[in-house]
Amino acid sequence: MQKYKISPIFGVSIGFYLYICNEITITNEIISLMKKKIRFSLVYRDMWQSSGKFQPRKDQLARIAPVIIDMGCFARVETNGGAFEQVNLLAGENPNEAVRAFCKPFNEVGIQTHMLDRGLNALRMYPVPDDVRQLMYKVKKAQGTDITRIFCGLNDTRNIIPSIKWAKEAGMIPQATLCITTSPIHTAEYYSAIADELIAAGAEEICLKDMAGIGQPALLGKLTKLIKTNHPDIIIQYHGHSGPGLSMASVLEVCNNGADIIDTAIEPLSWGKVHPDIISVQSMLKNEGFDVPEINMNAYMQARALTQEFIDDWLGYFINPANKLMSSLLLGCGLPGGMMGSMMADLGGIYNAINKLRVKKGEAELSMDDMLVKLFNEVEYVWPRVGYPPLVTPFSQYTKNIALMNLLTIEQGKGRYVMMDDAMWGMILGKSGKIPGEIAPELKELAVKQKREFTDVDPHTLLDNALDGFRKEMKDNGWECGQDDEELFELAMHPEQYRIYKSGMAKKNFLADLQKAKDAKLGTKLSVEELAAFKHAKADALTAP
């Protein structure tokens, strides 16, 4: 006989007796009957971010929310956050109305809502003043968001801990995040120590954010067990992308080691470089013996059809088909699948420039596959030299851009690190937080040569508060600050996009871009004459002699 202490995570599968007893003597046979309960979250926001540029409109979100509820398997839904509000503004839509409309149905039935929060950068790609970050939590709580998933791409706790405090003050649940990657530095013990610090600072949950899907399953299992051993009451939520193909193994590993909640997606946006589908995850865990909720398949098919309708309506024109494909090549470079679309667009311009240079030198042109492999190899070269920053927004973009520019300047005979902007240098110099590893000597020497200074100053102390200036701008323009100051918040968080939105130009620009995308898609299927006839259906098409 062996003595076990019963943790609340095991649920009540062997009766009320286990519930009321703190410690009992039981056999291994009884232990095997106890099923760990696993809950699921639908990352509806991230499904779209990892697939394309835009998010569904308010009316579309309001239509799908009741269907998600009817599926009966989701304890949580990711409703908003980074890459949600900004793209709403770019489409000429009000993100505050969208967040309220999407959160409300879930709030009414007790499904928790959560948002993505970039810590120091909040909802954008560059640092945000303290007073604007504080306001964000008050606004999001008022709009119906329960949980904020706070991350720093560098895992610098200085960028996360203030947000934990402000989120708690606003009544939100702060979920602190570990950005997962695979490097000699990023061990289970390294991450566990960060989790200890974040939990001591007030984090109520921990998210393992495997944004590129390159976290090794064994490491993720070991890390989960370490955190649960040290903090048995802390909820652990796993978020893993499916791009490189490790995600299902990782889900099984973290669940077998104590994880509580798994992020999932639904068709037609699951898999590829997005997330595993709820059906597959539920089936695997159910057959492994976990206590998981059943899926209402009629509602699943309805949600699937609605999501496809949104794609066909307009969102699909901004989705890169390559994001539907998995790729083991991602394991080497570590880039997240969600940025592959923008990366391929950037690569196209460099590809043409490099091939022109090669032709001038009498060398054979490269295929796009050749260029892609060269870029992945260059990212592998650059990444350790810039200190192994986890490749998540914005550091994935910075690292990729350094590698991309290197390919061009190497071809030009100028060497590496010639075309680096202030944002790239800011990461290297420590202005965004502490880099996990060592910066390469050649970059340190280049910084000295360019009179750039490294810093270890707490990043958020470098910014002055800014709300008073934005309040004045709202007043001067005759703009209302909005319910719970939500319009003031949008201006302060996304000043450039909000001003264009208020001018009406955002909607005009978006509609022009949409028409251009539709024309481009039609143009691949129709002749010039057919395209003209389609666009002017009631007119007689004329063809020049």
Model-predicted segments: where are they?
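Short, positively charged and aromatic/hydrophobic N-terminal segments
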Residues: Y4-K5, I9, S13-I30
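Catalytic cores of alpha/beta
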Residues: A193-I194, G245-N257
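Terminal or standalone catalytic/regulatory effector modules within metabolic enzymes
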Residues: I69-V87, A322-P545
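C-terminal helical cap(s) of enzyme catalytic domains, especially alpha/beta-barrels
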Residues: S270-P293
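Conserved, mostly hydrophobic/aromatic
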Residues: M47, I150, I206, G258, ...
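Active-site beta->alpha loop and helix N-cap motifs at the rims of alpha/beta catalytic domains
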Residues: P66, G81-I194, A212-Q216
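Glycine-rich phosphate-binding active-site loops on the catalytic face of alpha/beta enzymes
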Residues: D210, N257-V274
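Hydrophobic faces of well-ordered beta-strands that scaffold small-molecule active sites
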Residues: R39-Y44, A75-T79, I111-R118, T148-R149, ...
